[in-house]
Amino acid sequence: VNDWGMAQLVGRYPEQFELCMGTLLNKRKKDPRLSYLKSRLPDKDTGLLAENSLNADFYQKALEKNLGFVRYEWESCGYPKRFPEEKTSLHLPFYQTNTSQYCTLYAQYREHNRGRQYLQTECPGYCQMQAFLYPEHLHMTGRYNSLFSLDQTILRALETGSVENAAFGEAEQEVQPDRAVLNLL
């Protein structure tokens, strides 16, 4: 489930559904440009990127009790994560960095400046055939109203080991995801 309204609706029928909190609801900082910032931050601050609210037991219990979530989905995003002890899926090698209600392709075509975005009520469908490319070292692309990136650390791990090592060798930790989800955009 990637929508709070849908979670509320299907959470009314716990005997019929086993809910999984999707990657869009599992909020965390995911941006390939963070690696440049990380080199300038003290280690104590970069370690904070490894966790989010799902690492708090009370939050997991509240999600399970109130909405019926029993599994959580994470995205590989180029830096270590600390996974909670609940059932966890890891999506790899692509991840979504952000989504906007505005269309950068529309702004580029109409305004010749992708920064001049505003809400559109009728979509001409530019994104059906076009995408934004970012500098190669970022491994990012802009498609539809979202930015996506490729986790290079996962690809390097695949070259030297198995899919399991790449997916679950995220960090020296006791808890690892129990399922890998391959996404190819």
Per-segment meaning from a language model:
Residues 1-185:
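Active-site pocket-lining/capping segments in soluble small-molecule metabolic enzymes
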